[in-house]
Amino acid sequence: MIRSSKERLLWAQFDALQLGSGWDEEDIEKPQILVEDVFGDSHPGSVHLNQVSEQVAYGIYEKGGKPGHFHVTDICDGCAQGHDGMNLILASREVICDMVEMHAGYVPWDGMVLSSSCDKSIPAHLKAMARVNIPAVFVPGGSMRPGPNQTTSLVAGDISLRQKRKDAITPAEIRNYKRTGCPSVGACTFMGTASTMQCMAEALGLALPGSALVPATMSELQFFARRAGRTIMELVRRNIRPIDILTPQAFRNAIIVHSAIGGSTNGLIHLPAIAKELGMELDPELFNEINPKIPHIGNINPSGKHLTESFWFAGGI
């Protein structure tokens, strides 16, 4: 008997409350899957995630499950630059992780699918998956499309500010950077923390192969989301949990990938935090041990030339 059905036998009010939320009697007999994202108007990496979760739900329905939707909006490192908002950014990782734990624990879900795109929400979700330890799949929210001349939000922010201080840029040029720096939804299109952590989710085995850094406006993102919905039902059936996937070798593999793609140094903060949720110690010296042995083959901005969607088109992780 699945976990949710066992608990339902103990407390009739549980069924009554779900029926009052729009579920029917057939729904409450099915495997119940938490579908949680960080959808909101906070930044381009999250504004489309409700559509991703809808596709996840379709996949769950296809395989005989019942999804339940929850949202905890994240905040953006870029929006927090240059003022006291930056003091809140790392703390938001813990808040999001804690909220997922609460949502996943207050009813006996049989599995969960989490979706996010960016710097602190992805490690928050990966930490939560490890902490809650029920069958789980992560769906990365994909990459933003590049602007004209490969413009990125990094150009619009950091580079234009430096040029302005040197009086080497006109107001019209700054305006152009602003208007072309973020031309679509998705994570910023360079190998910052957001793109790095999408890659780490896939390298760890918590996201489907090929799903990190999908161009966020392409239908492929919807296909991966629907496939994740189907996959979680198989994981529930086989009771495969994050603790079965997040082995010491999985973390070592992630560090190897991190080195090869020139990943953000924030990986040194987030990967050990994920491991700690499982009682593992991920010594920072392991990064020092692995990095000199792994060639930097990912020619990806800012340590290389190309933007993240080019990396995905070339084969990705």
Description of each model-found segment:
Residues M1-K30:
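N-terminal amphipathic/basic leader segments beginning at the initiator methionine
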Residues M1-S4, D27-I28, G64-V72, P171-Y177, ...:
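Flexible, glycine/charged-enriched surface loops at secondary-structure junctions
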Residues W11, E29, S46, N50, ...:
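Conserved structured core elements
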Residues A16-G22, P183-A187, A254-V257, G304-L307:
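Glycine-rich, charged/polar anion/phosphate-binding loops
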Residues E25-P140:
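Long, structured ligand/cofactor-binding scaffold of large enzymes
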Residues I33-V35, D119, M200, T265, ...:
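Buried hydrophobic positions in well-ordered alpha/beta secondary-structure cores of metabolic enzymes
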Residues V52, Y61-K63, D74, P140-P146, ...:
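Terminal amphipathic helices with adjacent charged low-complexity linkers/tails
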Residues I89-N253, H258, G263:
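Active-site cavity-forming subdomains of large catalytic enzyme subunits
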